[in-house]
Amino acid sequence: MELPFAESWKIKMVEPIHKSTREQREQWLKEAHYNVFQLTADKVYIDLLTDSGTGAMSDRQWSALMMGDESYAGASSFLKLKETITKITGFDYILPTHQGRAAENVLFSYLVKQGDIVPGNSHFDTTKGHIESRHATALDCTVDIAKDTQAEYPFKGNVDIKKLEKALEENKDKIPFIIITITNNTAGGQPVSMANLREVRELADKYKKPVLFDSARFAENAYFIKVREEGYANKTIKEICLEMFKYADGMTMSAKKDGLVNIGGFIATRLKEWYEGAKSYCIMYEGYLTYGGMAGRDMSALAAGLEENTEFEMLETRIKQVEYLAKRLDEYGIPYQRPAGGHAIFLDARKILTHVPAEEFPAQTLTVELYLEAGIRGVEIGYILADRDPVTRENRFGGLDLLRLAIPRRVYTDNHMNVVAVALKNVFDRREKITRGVKITWEAEIMRHFTVQLERLQ
């Protein structure tokens, strides 16, 4: 008999979590204006808000933390981090930042100007925010099949080459670069194939445009290439990473995901022009060039985390837990973006809460219902996150409306996933009775989902 799968690590430290009553949760959520971002962590039983900075570090990372060099300039921790990044990506020029959105802010301050158009595959919230706040346009060129949540397609994160070429033909002088998000978070944590990365590079070369990767989950993307794309089964994750980054000119990185740390990020590039152009913004916004807003100890932990998370066993353990939750949802017939993504399950709220109109935000309503059911915090990746059109100020209802359940790395067991699955089943079983959603009572002009205030409709 074949041995069953088991995690590639063992647990060394634990943290207690506590259940609450539905009555308590109703009061807490009302006080939070039905925005789960406004809940304090002690009011959450299983926290699937994000996998960003919420994972558990290894003993090797903790030991690296203690060896951090806190020198203001030229710290050995930075040199080790730089060496590790270059080994994995092939990029020689590195600017550390305190997290991913800071990397975008620094680099986009140099690259993006008013009137620009930045095509890519489903820019995530901060990426789109940094583009639109500079009065530029984030143009989504994701493949159409990504919108069909029930279609089984291995690389739903891909760029639609025809859409991209049309954008390049029509707006050549307005495009500073092409951006590819790996994996494609907004489309459901879906990967981009190596063949697609290669095609984008060829098109970029044809139109003489640089390519930037939003690389928060690059290692998960490499895992999917290994297990799903022909010709890569016998390659190591590190070999696949080097080939992926061969098709880019640079990357921004939130190290809080595939770097396995609680804080940190960086810019890496092969273009000296980008490095020189972004340097002054790094110093102005983040800090000196060899720490960029990160403590030396965090850079040391990040270097160790990047090494760990570009090994197959670590990624296999992580992604199989996501797949486990997906299989439980399949047992109950609950629709989600298929196949399961690398870091999260994305529930298709429009297919679950069929009686809640788009104008009442079904995915946010589902987020509310799941928290009330079991104290589980997910996050809406849908119509609220999409923000209003910067020109017309109308809500954007054209994309998917999803509830994301992002699973922190090395934190929860499959028993926790069973609780999540049954809680969702309970909500799913009463879906016909959920006919009203929520309305916005206050919102910020941009990236409103973090602070929006809502009212529950009866």
Curated annotation (Swiss-Prot):
SUPFAM superfamilies, alphabetized: PLP-dependent transferases (SSF53383)
A biological-process GO annotation: aromatic amino acid metabolic process
Keywords (A to Z) from UniProt: Lyase, Pyridoxal phosphate
EC numbers: 4.1.99.-
One function term, GO molecular function aspect: carbon-carbon lyase activity
The protein's required cofactors: pyridoxal 5'-phosphate
Gene3D superfamilies xrefs: Aspartate Aminotransferase, domain 1, Type I PLP-dependent aspartate aminotransferase-like (Major domain)
Enzyme class label: lyase
Positions of modified residues (N6-(pyridoxal phosphate)lysine): K257
InterPro entries linked: ArAA_b-elim_lyase/Thr_aldolase, Beta-eliminating_lyase, PyrdxlP-dep_Trfase, PyrdxlP-dep_Trfase_major, PyrdxlP-dep_Trfase_small, Tryptophanase_CS
One Pfam family this sequence matches: Beta_elim_lyase
Family designation: Belongs to the beta-eliminating lyase family.
Protein name in the entry: Probable beta-eliminating lyase
Source taxonomy: Eukaryota, Metamonada, Parabasalia, Trichomonadida, Trichomonadidae
